[in-house]
Amino acid sequence: MGWKIVMKQQKLVEKMTIEEKAAILSGKTVWQTREIDRLSIPSIFLSDGPHGIRKQAGAGDHLGLNASLNATCFPTAATIANSWNQDLGEEIGQALGEEAASMDVSILLGPGLNIKRSPLCGRNFEYFSEDPYLSGKMAASYIRGIQSKGVYACPKHLAVNSQELRRMAMDAVVDERTLREIYLTGFEIAVKEGHAKAIMSSYNQINGIYANEDKHLLTDILRKDWGFDGIVITDWGGSNDHVKGVAAGSNLEMPSCGYDSAREVIAAVRNGKLKEADLDERVGELVDAVMELTSGKKLSDKNFDRNAHHQLARKAAAESMVLLKNEKQILPLDTKKSIAIIGDFAFSPRYQGAGSSMVNPTKVEDMSSILQQYDLNILGMTRGYHRNGDVDENDRKFALNLSMNADIVIFCFGLDEISESEGLDRTHMRIPQDQIDLLQDISKVNENIIGILSAGSAIEMPWNTCCKAILHGYLNGQAGASATLDILTGKVNPSGRLAETYPISYEQTPAYRYYPSNEKTSEYRESVYVGYRYYDTSKVRVQFPFGFGLSYTEFTYSDLIIEEDGIKVSVTNTGDRDGAEVVQMYVGLPNAIVFRPEKELKGFAKVYLKAGESRQLRIPFDDKTFRYWNIKTGQWEIETGTYQIMVGASVADIRLTGMTERTGNSKGYPYNPAKMPYYYTGIVQKISDEEFRELLGHEIPNGRWSGNLEINDAICQMYYAKSRLARLIYRCLTKMKKKSEAQGKPDLNILFIYNMPFRGIAKMTGGAVSMEMVYGIVDAVNGHFMLGVKKVVGGYFRNRRNNKKYEKLLKGAGGKRR
């Protein structure tokens, strides 16, 4: 596909005035685009989210503080990634598209496929994996499903958006090879194989340029290299310089910021800073999308099959849970044995994360209310602990007595709501200590403990010896309770495999010295050694490796055949239960000239086999199997050599190995091993400035904060503001933030404001505040109070006057084209 997109609605664009063109590139409301009535260009509705529709019933707000319509809450992306099942992803996508269409939503903001650089990222539950290949394949399946229902999918957040702390005011410093191989490959697959029709740009800068203003990213890579023919949408409030965004390839600034940005666009065209051809191209792409989404569209069926979608959520959850441990085959449960169920999560499940993706579910199951549907000998159940930290000694004693008298204890525990949320990164990888204290005390009176985990990201598990079995449900959606019991009772054979590594401790992780950034820049010194690529290459022992998961049956691998364009391998179910295996293909190049991980996932297949059944699978090679990005030549190349093809049940459980010769096309190798010794060993936790500079190919940017605050500095940085009032506001915000954290429920509004740059005040207030006023606010914060107040007051009246004038121009459009 050529990168130059022919406008289908060119004649329509030619009829538009410059005021209309500039206005349509910014939102009308929080969730709607702007219509042009005289040309019959309608408004369309956008909505979160990645695992369920979050369309608000009343006035819209970015974080969902107002109630949303009921929708199916499917398991989060982090959960579904563990299924390794692209067909399941597509089926979920179809259901999401159907529900979106029923609510007149034209663009669904998801899936999220940022790379899990660190387990501490507060939004990891929304992302698929630490591996770009698996992330991209699963995202593409969602996208195909969503778009099959006439709704655009909008994968997010392009790109290198791996931390929540000051996400709108942070610069990701990353070398081009790591950018291409790790942080863009998933998006590339989503575009090329999923044919995504929209993309959301991220808040952050990439090497000093905001993602939404990065022409290299949005035009050279996205449109030219990948053939993207859709629209680029900002993250909400993520537009820094709208004119630069339009020039770079961004189509739609969200949410509404009044007409401030439109006036900037018109001024830029008139003074030559923005080519009118670029403006027309962005408008044409957006109008093409709007008309495609609305032309010939029938009235939506306001109903969807709630029960069918609930059952799909149940199936998806069951297929995505990971059995991490099963000593002495304690699972599936013996129905004759007495069972005690302990844990707050058994009564109030944690089935989704917090933030803009939060869904108002059609129904929610909890284990306590559906137990009667299963043939189990339940001795009793109680909380034993409270996830908010409240202590009830009587309940705790009852839990211990109950455990003492039961044959088996099912202990439900995990991360609480404050641990994982948009806008907030974790500070450690531990489960709350009160839960672990109770688990350890129970283990002293009953050795038959089955741990049921709820968490959206990797955790430390020093307590795992207390459990005879561990079933990890992740955040498994509204039907997670029945899915859990289906596995515990043997109705479903677990087939989930970890889509991320579980290290023994946080200090083992490759980026732990660099994450999260507390300065202006976040330095990606670990390069391509993210997740298993690091642990496997540097021989770091982990708790559970990438791709790991147990089953109630056993599988053997045999007869590996390596062909020019792929492999064939036979898999046999040697157990006495039907089950599914995830066959994983890794590729490595021993003694490579260009440093690289020891092995990388390059293909996988999930196969369902009856007891005793054997089947031959084929996993193809593709354009990503042997490639690396050569920073010297600026292109994808293949290094000549004998590649290892490794097939197994996890990155650490390789069953079959073979070799294949490949003739490369490298035109000069990019690195000097003598200057990059640690990158060649994979031991990247303490990369020196000299070695990182060699990797980047240029000086390391100065990431220190300057004395004066600027419009792109975060509001939470007012702790060193010169203005006493600003410091007081900072203390008040911090107090409110800490109060919500102490209560166990994050205040999303406070978190968003806390990490928002000053310019966000103009971008998130619907036109009430202009950028002129923001500059005044910053002047006041920096100690120039009277100057700042003058700009704010004067700017307020000028903004009102100019907005009214712009409205009149739009209403009077259609006469002489300006």
Language model features: what each stretch is:
Residues 1-624, 642-647, 651, 756, ...:
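Glycoside hydrolase catalytic-domain context in secreted enzymes
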Residues 623-670:
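Terminal connector regions
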Residues 651-652, 658-729:
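Charged, amphipathic alpha-helical linkers/stalks
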Residues 694-818:
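Long, low-hydrophobicity ectodomains and other hydrophilic envelope-associated domains
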